């Protein structure tokens, strides 16, 4: 199984095909388990597959929402112009969600502490941001964060990042998550003065929902019909 890619676009195409070919039927998805891979060029965040039609404008809005630190979906609506239905389904009675990762890394000043740690102790193994918090499981009824943690390490004088996820939907989750995590990596790089290294991404469960299977073939069938 290939585990190193130039960028997220290469990884998306590879795992889309692999999920079709080797994925296990799991609930309403096709899934692969304990998938880990490296992106050598984390700044290359574009997903170019024509059948995916990735919305970079939305990914940028989600990143700005993370930077705001607000758990309120209304803040995303102000930035993007509307609140996608998936966030409406996940919000609590106060219109808040747990999966604004910026809100999570600002709690306890985690991001600031990671930056300080990397600057003061480049060999640290503790530069970790925790997203999922087992002590808050009673709050996760509608919205359980898909990401466990993000860890940074200095190797060969470059900043490397590892993202560990309990669950990752390849179609929506990975495409938007990799954009935001890459932006986070660039921000930490700028604040610490280290060059960007590699981005390692691990998902215990990497999946496609069944309604996203065959989207590449559907596009080809439409092209053949109108040829």
Which residues does each PLM region occupy?
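Terminal, non-catalytic protein-protein interaction segments that mediate quaternary/complex assembly
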Residues: 1-227
